[in-house]
């Protein structure tokens, strides 16, 4: 796999609270230079990124109900709608983990449905926060996402105790089938890890280390 190829898997990410306008402009410039699929940013910076990325192929991804997923569904839906209005084309929402742990699966489903309805053509990714879930909970959540026809299931926020694992990526791919994307995020910081995720079913990589991933491919002549 060449660096150009893997670049189109990457959502180039900056979600921590201290990011400045210049940080976001730098992120956008890097995404343009390296042909990353998107930038993944907090919604307050969408207008800035939209202006910077106009007339480029780089998409804008943002997060909803982030990072806890415990917001009211109406708030998540409103957040998604406003983000899309501002210029986002992809929405990464956090599933309600507490409802999963409470076995309130109908509420979990309704929460996703509310955001999906608000997306109005934008692609929806559902963050499961797999480090907090059992294998059975991951399977059930993926089945709901498959039934609803979301765009992607995603492993992690990157703000909790663990990130993506090869085992969970393979499990998620097995459950959702081939028609839904699988995004690996959290802890994917080097070329070898990214390639392993892709080999096991990931079709998108969320990382703040996109340049390191690309440089690893370049420096090692695509040996992974």
From Swiss-Prot:
Catalytic site: 92 (proton donor/acceptor), 154 (schiff-base intermediate with acetaldehyde), 183 (proton donor/acceptor)
GO molecular function terms attached to this record: deoxyribose-phosphate aldolase activity
Any single GO CC term annotated in Swiss-Prot or TrEMBL for this entry: cytoplasm
Disulfide bonds: none
Main location: cytoplasm
Biological process per Gene Ontology, one example term: carbohydrate catabolic process
Keywords carried by this UniProt record: Cytoplasm, Lyase, Schiff base
InterPro entries, per database record: Aldolase_TIM (IPR013785), DeoC (IPR011343), DeoC/FbaB/LacD_aldolase (IPR002915), DeoC_typeI (IPR028581)
SMART domains in alphabetical order: DeoC
Compartment(s) of residence: Cytoplasm
Pathway: Carbohydrate degradation; 2-deoxy-D-ribose 1-phosphate degradation; D-glyceraldehyde 3-phosphate and acetaldehyde from 2-deoxy-alpha-D-ribose 1-phosphate: step 2/2
Catalytic activity: 2-deoxy-D-ribose 5-phosphate = D-glyceraldehyde 3-phosphate + acetaldehyde
Pfam family, one: DeoC
Entry's EC annotation: 4.1.2.4
Family: Belongs to the DeoC/FbaB aldolase family. DeoC type 1 subfamily.
Protein's job: Catalyzes a reversible aldol reaction between acetaldehyde and D-glyceraldehyde 3-phosphate to generate 2-deoxy-D-ribose 5-phosphate.
NCBIfam families: deoC
PANTHER family cross-referenced by the UniProt entry: DEOXYRIBOSE-PHOSPHATE ALDOLASE
Protein's name in the database: Deoxyribose-phosphate aldolase
